[in-house]
Amino acid sequence: MQHQIRALLLFLLSGSACAMFYPRPKDYPRLGKRSFFTTVNGNHYPRIGRRDATGSSLVLPEADYTDLGDLTKRGVFTQGAHGSYPRVGRGGAVLSRDYLNERSKNLEKMSGDKDDDLEVDNGDGSRRLQAGHSGIPLEILFIAYDSDNDGKLSKEEFVTGLAQYQMQCPLY
């Protein structure tokens, strides 16, 4: 009797695995139906919750008729040209003045000219960085580390830039 129960359980388990991973061709996509996740629409893969290269309008369900203008929202990922994969933090928009001021201030700091307002006197003549001002945004670090200005960050540029940053801003 034990062998018959084990054979029945094995048959049920293998049957459910086959039903899950080998569905009918025109069945609704479920787990294991690879073509649903890898089919291409035009020249890019389907993305959930991201805008396409042409831009789309965002309609809020609680919005009134007069509020249905085109709402643009820039997310973490900025869309590349012609529907390509998004690149992190490299949008083609014009940089604002605040961003340029912050960038130039941090570039001066990394080149050796430290700002005194970011440092605090310990009382014994030594100085330390304020805890809230120890981070620099990644876009500014990318521009600062890219020494040959080709728009690509090589391993050597990253290592030398990181060494310069650690000398200017110790982590303790």
UniProtKB/Swiss-Prot annotation:
The modification Isoleucine amide is found at residue 48. It comes from Helix lucorum (Snail). Neurotransmitter or neuromodulator peptides that mediate withdrawal behavior such as pneumostome activity in the respiratory system. Possibly regulates calcium levels in command premotor interneurons. The keyword Iron does not apply. Residues 1-19 form the signal peptide. This is HCS2 neuropeptides. Residues 133-168 form the EF-hand domain. GO terms for cellular component: axonal growth cone; cytoplasm; endoplasmic reticulum; neuron projection cytoplasm; neuronal cell body; perikaryon; secretory granule; transport vesicle. Its main location: cytoplasm. It is found in: Cytoplasm; Cytoplasmic vesicle, Secretory vesicle; Perikaryon; Endoplasmic reticulum. Keywords: Amidation, Calcium, Cleavage on pair of basic residues, Cytoplasm, Cytoplasmic vesicle, Endoplasmic reticulum, Metal-binding, Neuropeptide, Signal.
